[in-house]
């Protein structure tokens, strides 16, 4: 519980959503690099690699998946994006649990971001 609480507090202090918004300057290539590479790697190593693992030490895997998915949704701030991110977080936690590696969630997250970018551009 302490680790989960500290993670939420760290997200609040960091102003993560504001930092993400400042990266999107209209430069498509910069946005693509951030969206497709940096975000999946950093977010998955934190949310699934660190937070999910710590929460699983304290609660069951389904409860840890729900908690980290909720944090993942809140991290994305916008209501619609937050709801989508919550359900995405459940899928990503499932992948982490089944494969016992953060690689699968990173690849899935990358693919989801790529699909979103393609839909936005075209």
Residues of each region from the PLM?
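Juxtamembrane helix-loop-helix connectors linking adjacent transmembrane helices
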Residues: 1-39, 53, 57
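Transmembrane helix-loop-helix hairpins at the membrane interface
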Residues: 28-122
